[in-house]
C-alpha cells in the first residue's frame, strides 16, 4: 500500500472518530439542556414554596363610603373601621363602591385587591346542577307553550332592543302550571340548555329554614347573585311551598314562610324590567298561590301545561320510543287512543313497561303487542291516582 493511500485511510479514520466524538458531544449537550430545564423548574418550584411560606396574609374588609378621590372608610372583618388609600387607584376607581369587598395590607391597611361579593354555598349548589342537553324537539305536544315561554324569557335576553322599538316593557316572569307529569320542569330545562345564560334551579321547599330571617336572606342573595351574573334565569320549582296565600292565623313556621314570600315579592319588584334577569315558576297547585304573586308586573304571563291531547300523545310516544329497538310496525295512534288521560310521564312509563315485557319474553326488541300490554298495565296503576281540579289562572 502506497504512502498516499495510507494517509488517506488515516484521514478518513480520523474523520470518523471526530464524527463519533461530535455525536457524543451533542448527546451530552442535550442531556445538559434537559438537566438545566429540570433544575430551572425545581428552582421555580422552590421559589414558589418559599414565597408561600413568607407570604403575609391580608385582612378582608368592606367599603363603607369614599371620603375623596383617594381615601375610603373601610370596615375590617374583625370590627374596626379605618380610613385607607388604594394601590393602583386608577384601575379600581369604578369598582370601589359602597358594599364592595376588598383586601387590606396587614401593616399599611392599603386596599390591595377587590373581591367578588360573598355568596352563600346554597346559591352555588343552585348553579352547580346542570340542566343537561334538552332540545325543544324532545318536548312533544307543547308547541304553543314553548313559543309563549320563549317570547317571555328568550326574546328579552337575546333581543332587548326589540321591546324598546315597540315601546313595551319586557315581561319579568312566567308561571307554568298544570297537572303533575306534563313537562313543566322539562320546559325550564330546555330553556336553560338552549340559552347562553346562567341558570339557577331553586327547589322552593329547600329555601325554608328553621331560623327566623334565614329564608329571606337566601332569597336576597339569590337575586343578588342573579344581578351580578346577568343574563340569568331563575327557575323556582314547586313555588306553592313558599308562595301560598297569606292568612292572619298560624304558627311561627307559617309566619316565617310568609316573611319569605314578602321578601320574594320585594325582590321581584326590585329589578329593572329590561335587566337580563328572568324568573320562571312552576306549580301544580295554582289555586293556593297568593294573589300578590300572580299579579301582572311580577308574573306577567301564566302558561297552562295541560294533559296532552291525542296528537300530543302520539308525538310524546314517538319521542320516547325513538331509541327503542322495535320489530315490525307500531301503530302509535291506536296506543294514543288507549292512553286517554295519560300525561307525558305516564307515556314515558308506557315505553319503559313495553321494554320490560320484551325482556320478560327474552327478546331484544319490542313489538306493538308489548306497547298495548304496557298501556293496559299503566291504566290499572292510574286508578290509584287522585284527580286534581283547579280553575285556570
Curated annotation (Swiss-Prot):
Source organism phylogeny: Eukaryota, Amoebozoa, Evosea, Eumycetozoa, Dictyostelia
Q: Name one GO biological process term.
A: ERAD pathway
Return the similarity comment: Belongs to the AAA ATPase family.
Report which residue ranges the record marks as coiled coil. Answer: none
Q: Which residues bind ATP?
A: 178-185
Where is it mainly found?
cytoplasm
**Subcellular compartments:** Cytoplasm; Nucleus
Q: Which InterPro entries match?
A: 26S_Proteasome_ATPase (IPR050221), AAA+_ATPase (IPR003593), AAA_lid_3 (IPR041569), ATPase_AAA_core (IPR003959), ATPase_AAA_CS (IPR003960), NA-bd_OB-fold (IPR012340), P-loop_NTPase (IPR027417), Prot_ATP_ID_OB_2nd (IPR032501)
Please give the GO cellular component terms listed in this UniProt entry: cytoplasm; nucleus; proteasome regulatory particle, base subcomplex
Official protein name in the record: 26S proteasome regulatory subunit 10B
**Swiss-Prot/TrEMBL keywords:** ATP-binding, Cytoplasm, Nucleotide-binding, Nucleus, Proteasome
Protein task: The 26S proteasome is involved in the ATP-dependent degradation of ubiquitinated proteins. The regulatory (or ATPase) complex confers ATP dependency and substrate specificity to the 26S complex.
Where is the chain membrane-spanning?
none
Q: Which GO terms describe its molecular function?
A: ATP binding; ATP hydrolysis activity; proteasome-activating activity
Q: Which PANTHER family match?
A: 26S PROTEASOME REGULATORY SUBUNIT (PTHR23073)
Amino acid at each position: 500500500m502506497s504512502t498516499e493511500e495510507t494517509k488517506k485511510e488515516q484521514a478518513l479514520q480520523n474523520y470518523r472518530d471526530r464524527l463519533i466524538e461530535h455525536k457524543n458531544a451533542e448527546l451530552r449537550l442535550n442531556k445538559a439542556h434537559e438537566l438545566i430545564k429540570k433544575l430551572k423548574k425545581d428552582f421555580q418550584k422552590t421559589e414558589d414554596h418559599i414565597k408561600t411560606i413568607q407570604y403575609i396574609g391580608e385582612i378582608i374588609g368592606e367599603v363603607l363610603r369614599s371620603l375623596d378621590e383617594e381615601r375610603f372608610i373601610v370596615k375590617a372583618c374583625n370590627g374596626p373601621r379605618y380610613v385607607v388609600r388604594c394601590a393602583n387607584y386608577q384601575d379600581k376607581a369604578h369598582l370601589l363602591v359602597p358594599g364592595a369587598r376588598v383586601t387590606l395590607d396587614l401593616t399599611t391597611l392599603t386596599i390591595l385587591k377587590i373581591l367578588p361579593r360573598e355568596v352563600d354555598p346554597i346559591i352555588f349548589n343552585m348553579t352547580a346542577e346542570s340542566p343537561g342537553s334538552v332540545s325543544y324537539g324532545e318536548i312533544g305536544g307543547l308547541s304553543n307553550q314553548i313559543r309563549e315561554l320563549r317570547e317571555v324569557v328568550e326574546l328579552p335576553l337575546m333581543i332587548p332592543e326589540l321591546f324598546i322599538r315597540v315601546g313595551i316593557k319586557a315581561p319579568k316572569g312566567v308561571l307554568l302550571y298544570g297537572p303533575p307529569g306534563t313537562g313543566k320542569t322539562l320546559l325550564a330545562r330546555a330553556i336553560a340548555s338552549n340559552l347562553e345564560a346562567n341558570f339557577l334551579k331553586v327547589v322552593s321547599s329547600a329555601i325554608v329554614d328553621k331560623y327566623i330571617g334565614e329564608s329571606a336572606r337566601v332569597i336576597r342573595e339569590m337575586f343578588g347573585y342573579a344581578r351580578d351574573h346577568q343574563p340569568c334565569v331563575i327557575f323556582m320549582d314547586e313555588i306553592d311551598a313558599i308562595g301560598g296565600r297569606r292568612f292572619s292565623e298560624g304558627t311561627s313556621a307559617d309566619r316565617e314562610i310568609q316573611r319569605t314570600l314578602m321578601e320574594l315579592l320585594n325582590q321581584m319588584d326590585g329589578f329593572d324590567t329590561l335587566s337580563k334577569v328572568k324568573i320562571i315558576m312552576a306549580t301544580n297547585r295554582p289555586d293556593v298561590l297568593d294573589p300578590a304573586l300572580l299579579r301582572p308586573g311580577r308574573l306577567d304571563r301564566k302558561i297552562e301545561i295541560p294533559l296532552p291531547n291525542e296528537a300530543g300523545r302520539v308525538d310524546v310516544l314517538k319521542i320516547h320510543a325513538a331509541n327503542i329497538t322495535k320489530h315490525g310496525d307500531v301503530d302509535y295512534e291506536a296506543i294514543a287512543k288507549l292512553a286517554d288521560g295519560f300525561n307525558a310521564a305516564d307515556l314515558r312509563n308506557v315505553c319503559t313497561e313495553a321494554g320490560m315485557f320484551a325482556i320478560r319474553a327474552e327478546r331484544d326488541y319490542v313489538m306493538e303487542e308489548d306497547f298495548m300490554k304496557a298501556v293496559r298495565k299503566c291504566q290499572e296503576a292510574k286508578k290509584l291516582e287522585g284527580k286534581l281540579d283547579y280553575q285556570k289562572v
